[in-house]
Amino acid sequence: MILKTAFSLPTPTTTLLSPSSPHQLNTLFFTRRRRRLISPSRLNSIFSQRRFSFSAAASGNNVFTSPETSKTFDFSSEEKIYKWWESQGYFKPNFDQGGSPFVIPMPPPNVTGSLHMGHAMFVTLEDIMVRYNRMNGRPTLWLPGTDHAGIATQLVVEKMLASEGIKRVDLGRDEFTKRVWEWKEKYGGTITNQIKRLGASCDWSRERFTLDEQLSRAVVEAFVKLHDKGLIYQGSYMVNWSPNLQTAVSDLEVEYSEEPGFLYHIKYRVAGSPDFLTIATTRPETLFGDVALAVHPEDDRYSKYVGQTAIVPMTYGRHVPIIADKYVDKDFGTGVLKISPGHDHNDYLLARKLGLPILNVMNKDATLNDVAGLFCGLDRFEVREKLWADLEEIGLAVKKEPHTLRVPRSQRGGEVIEPLVSKQWFVHMDPLAEKALLAVENKELTIIPERFEKIYNHWLTNIKDWCISRQLWWGHRIPVWYVVGKDCEEDYIVAKSAEEALEKALEKYGKDVEIYQDPDVLDTWFSSSLWPFSTLGWPDVAAKDFNNFYPTNMLETGHDILFFWVARMVMMGIEFTGTVPFSHVYLHGLIRDSQGRKMSKSLGNVIDPLDTIKDFGTDALRFTIALGTAGQDLNLSTERLTANKAFTNKLWNAGKFVLHSLPSLSDTSAWENLLDLKLDKEETLLSLPLPECWAVSKLHILIDSVTASYEKLFFGDVGRETYDFFWSDFADWYIEASKSRLYGSGGNSVSLASQAVLLYVFENILKLLHPFMPFVTEDLWQALPYRKEALIVSPWPQNSLPRNVESIKRFENLQALTRAIRNARAEYSVEPVKRISASVVGSAEVIEYISKEKEVLALLSRLDLNNVHFSNAPPGDANLSVHLVASEGLEAYLPLAAMVDISSEVQRISKRLSKMQTEYDALITRLSSPKFVEKAPEEVVRGVKEQVEELEEKIKLTKARLDFLKSTTSLVSQ
């Protein structure tokens, strides 16, 4: 029966094998003839005689190789294929077929970056999306670019200058910035070229850099607009401060590590009382910044002290209030908390809530300032040791006990980050966050996987104002100017240029004013938050690209920057363009090592993508990465890469077989007949022999399933389903079955059908796999005859093509019969080269279609073609045969004497049975020992019991086989 699905997806262009006029099939075309089996040596001979080479579209440029001439796919050809794609303009959006554009802004890697597995992950996933949509006829734009990476780039250049004995401050700002630009021009393209190695089919003609003139204009425009709305302000607030870099850093640039340390117990005298309150702290050096002691309001131990004051040690009698607040954890330390709001994020928030003063005791280089008295000028960690010694000397040190610390360290350099109150520029986030929350709530924005919506909502609901200023020289200079002589926090000018700022200053203060620009630059994430629309021409809303491609369709990135980048892009997109910048967000996880550990240099488990490409090929790496699940971490191992390299080789070898099997190009008549077979038409499908009908039907089912998975972004399902179909159905079954038709004596008609099916199925497999494995599939595609276009732009297979469910069931019966015979051969150790006889028994209906595939069955099962018999009743020598049940209504009998030397087999199985029995007895003895059962780990005992059960089943089956052999021996002797 023929089934057609109602599944609806974007309709691709008609394929090469699907002309507008349907072919009327000649009913005599598929006449069946008896054919003989061909030996492997004969097949090789035929292969050699029928070899031919097809000219590829770019063969003149030596771009492509062919399985006809190359034993394996040559990884070195990947670069040539990539350059050819790019030279043909395939990466640019093509509006010829109409349709709505598919647009992805590439997450811009740092210009200082070197390719790592995180890059490989996002490039693979985004390229899959882009290639799939391109093949579906949509104009695709994958817009690439790099980030200026303020801190990282400045550090790289400073290090380079240091090797020359030059300091940044000696050069001055302008000269240093010039040197950074020179470095960028020389080395900035490294990461771009490495991304190309991964096969990224992005439009490099539109490549952007966050410090490009146009993007810089967008940054200034955004700052001015936000300031004009009162959303940007300047103030002194708590930030993450890098003492070495002398700048504020973002939360993402702070990594917390669990490290051994101490919890210091220190006594504070209660003023006007002989009593002391003992606090516990991990940072005694900050006590100079204490502004209060806090206890829990329900802690009866300290309730009588609330409202009194305490004297801070080593501060010459400075008093601080003793307060009560539920923020205090009664069970931590002593239950008394010192409040140092100038040097602790939580203390800072509590002080702001309660109106406590903020006292800073640190200089920007992490030495203590004059508030610390005698400790002024000493490093914070040196003060910790000296202060504790002094406290011990005066009797205020109670004890210090080992304690695991959660230490904030800089992502760059590893220094300990200092919470510090500093004058910075901030964005007021609450009004922006409200709109971003509504975007998800109103389904304007879909986050994949859905579970990350909760994290997104939590972050935006509890959002803090964003510190956007950095004390660096490399980056977008903050568009704020000050008037010389009027330096105060409130007296500044925001303008789009120095000329505009001077004009405003003259207007405000009259003649003879001198202005200077704020020395700080903007946080790199500020320019990145504008990326989806600044790269398309904004703030010029009339720009062609902005109108054609904004808003974009998809933002794909790691789940770790959902807040730092994705949420900020959503907020800025809504604020400046009135719409979400992308309709979908696809989040991937981390790539870990084979043991599930995060890759790090310290562990020595970092896998280099470029080394991986060299050893396994880009396609194997991409396929391995793509088999993951959205939002989940992926464990990467050489075993997986090796397996998928083998998959690449299997594809190549299948291509070699298909090419060998096709008619010679000089045989134009054969090619006309072959191309005239429209295998996506129902009438053609119904006329195919069973194996061919099965293969095409299974392919059509696969196309629907895989296309649906592509649409749902279930890439792991796409990879697994296509892999299984290619390897199990096509390579293991259909290619093997086709050999009985291609190289036998049955004439050209059935051979032509098999050739057409081989080509049709293989070319569609290449299409389905191309987004995952672009290089090997394009190379194989170009080797196939009559290719009118490159695979990268060939139409996606059509959906809802016919399939014959009955043929699938029938071929599955043939497979079951083949497996049963193969298993019997293995069980009785029949030599692979030996052809055996068989009697196939089944109903008249089953025998009718199975017998038509006698040659296929004989080839796949290694049967003697002249001694394969079909009947609806068991043979006369059934009691001397191995009885196989393949499926309901389909059985087989294999004459035992023709298969093996029965007496030798009896001896062999008897030895095996004896060995099994010995193993079984030993296990039973262990289980009979109370000492073992009572003292051995539970899982060990359970494992032994499972071995016993397994052996019992094996012994039972082996005894049955031995009894059968012995009974056969006695019957034969009679």
Swiss-Prot record:
The LRR repeats lie at 432-454, 857-880
Show the PROSITE patterns listed in the entry: AA_TRNA_LIGASE_I (PS00178)
| The keyword Transmembrane helix belongs to this UniProt entry's keyword annotation | no
Question: What's in the GO CC field?
Answer: chloroplast; chloroplast stroma; mitochondrion
Which residues are ATP-binding?
K601
Query: Any phenotype upon disruption?
Result: Embryo defective. Developmental arrest of the embryo at the globular stage.
Q: Where is this motif: 'HIGH' region?
A: 109-119
Q: According to its UniProt record, where is this protein located? A: Plastid, Chloroplast; Mitochondrion
Provide any one GO MF term from the record.
valine-tRNA ligase activity
Coiled-coil stretches are 489-518
What InterPro entries is this protein classified in?
aa-tRNA-synth_I_CS, aa-tRNA-synth_Ia, Anticodon_Ia_Val, M/V/L/I-tRNA-synth_anticd-bd, Rossmann-like_a/b/a_fold, tRNA-bd_arm, tRNAsynth_Ia_anticodon-bd, Val-tRNA_synth_C_sf
Key words of the record? Aminoacyl-tRNA synthetase, ATP-binding, Chloroplast, Coiled coil, Leucine-rich repeat, Ligase, Mitochondrion, Nucleotide-binding, Plastid, Protein biosynthesis, Repeat, Transit peptide
| Keyword 4Fe-4S (UniProt) | no
Name the reaction it catalyses. tRNA(Val) + L-valine + ATP = L-valyl-tRNA(Val) + AMP + diphosphate
Q: Name one GO biological process term.
A: valyl-tRNA aminoacylation
- Main location per UniProt? plastid
Motif 'KMSKS' region mapped to chain: 598-602
Going by the entry's taxonomy, the superkingdom of the source organism is recorded as: Eukaryota
Disulfide bridge map: none
EC number(s) stated in the UniProt entry for this protein = 6.1.1.9
User: Family per UniProt?
Assistant: Belongs to the class-I aminoacyl-tRNA synthetase family.
User: Mind telling me what this protein is named?
Assistant: Valine--tRNA ligase, chloroplastic/mitochondrial 2
**Gene expressing this chain:** EMB2247
